From Swiss-Prot:
This is Cytochrome b6. NCBIfam families: PRK03735.1. Heme c binds at residue 35. GO terms for biological process: photosynthesis; respiratory electron transport chain. InterPro entries: Cyt_b/b6_N, Cyt_B6_PetB, Cytb/b6-like_sf, Cytochrome_b_N_euk/bac, Di-haem_cyt_TM. It comes from Pisum sativum. Heme b 2 binds at residues 86, 187. The keyword Mitochondrion does not apply. Heme 1 (or BH or b566) is high-potential and absorbs at about 566 nm, and heme 2 (or BL or b562) is low-potential and absorbs at about 562 nm. Keywords: Chloroplast, Electron transport, Heme, Iron, Membrane, Metal-binding, Photosynthesis, Plastid, Thylakoid, Transmembrane, Transmembrane helix, Transport. The gene is petB.
C-alpha cells in the first residue's frame, strides 16, 4: 500500500496539498454561525445524490410525470425516503442560505476586498431560488402546474421584453410538454452545473481571502 502511495506522492505531491489544507489558520472568533455556508453546501450535495437517484424512475412527460412520482413514493424501494430527504434538504438549503446571507451581511463580509465573494454568493442565492421554482413543477400535479402558470406569467410585467420572456419560459404559446421538458433540463443539468461552478469560485475566494472579522 505504501508503494502505491509513494507512486502518487512522487507525481502529485499529495502530502504538500494535504498540509496546505490542514494548516490553514482559523480565526478565534469563528463560531457555529460560520458553519452555515458549509451546511448549505452539504444540503446541495444531498440534493444532487437524491435527485440523481430519482432520475432512474421519473419520467418528464405531462402524461407520466405524476404517475412516476407516485411510483417513487409507493413502489420503488426506499423511494419515499429518497424523495422525502430531497424535499427536506431543499427546505434546509434555503433556510441555511438565508441565515448565511444574514450572517455575512451583519459581519460585513461583503466589504472590500470580498466584493466578488459576495457577488458569487448572490448568484448562488438566485440559482437556489430557481431550483425551487423548477423543482416544484416536476410532479406536474395541480400545485406544480399552476405554480408554473404563475411563474411564467410574471415576466409579462417587464416593459418591452416582457412578452418575449413569457414565450421563452414555457417554450411555447401555452404551458405544456415543452415547459416541463425545459424545467426538467434546467433542474437536473443546467442549474446543478452552474451551482457547482459558482460554489467552487465562492470557496476558492474564501480560501484565498480568509474569513472576515468577528460580529
Amino acid at each position: 500500500m505504501s508503494k502505491v502511495y509513494d507512486w502518487f506522492e512522487e507525481r502529485l505531491e499529495i502530502q504538500a496539498i494535504a498540509d496546505d489544507i490542514t494548516s490553514k489558520y482559523v480565526p478565534p472568533h469563528v463560531n457555529i454561525f460560520y458553519c452555515l455556508g458549509g451546511i448549505t453546501l452539504t444540503c446541495f450535495l444531498v440534493q444532487v445524490a437524491t435527485g440523481f437517484a430519482m432520475t432512474f424512475y421519473y419520467r418528464p412527460t405531462v402524461t407520466e410525470a405524476f404517475a412516476s412520482v407516485q411510483y417513487i413514493m409507493t413502489e420503488a424501494n426506499f423511494g419515499w425516503l429518497i424523495r422525502s430527504v430531497h424535499r427536506w434538504s431543499a427546505s434546509m438549503m434555503v433556510l441555511m442560505m438565508i441565515l448565511h446571507v444574514f450572517r455575512v451581511y451583519l459581519t460585513g463580509g461583503f466589504k472590500k476586498p470580498r466584493e466578488l465573494t459576495w457577488v458569487t454568493g448572490v448568484v448562488l442565492g438566485v440559482l437556489t431560488a430557481t431550483f425551487g421554482v423548477t423543482g416544484y413543477s416536476l410532479p406536474w400535479d395541480q400545485i406544480g402546474y399552476w405554480a408554473v402558470k404563475f411563474v411564467t406569467g410574471v415576466p409579462d410585467a417587464i416593459p418591452v421584453i416582457g412578452s418575449s420572456x413569457v414565450e421563452l419560459l414555457p417554450a411555447s404559446a401555452s404551458v405544456g410538454q415543452s415547459t416541463l421538458t425545459r424545467f426538467y433540463s434546467l433542474h437536473t443539468f443546467v442549474l446543478p452545473l452552474l451551482t457547482a461552478v459558482f460554489m467552487l469560485m465562492h470557496f476558492l475566494m474564501i480560501r484565498k481571502q480568509g474569513i472576515f472579522g468577528p460580529l
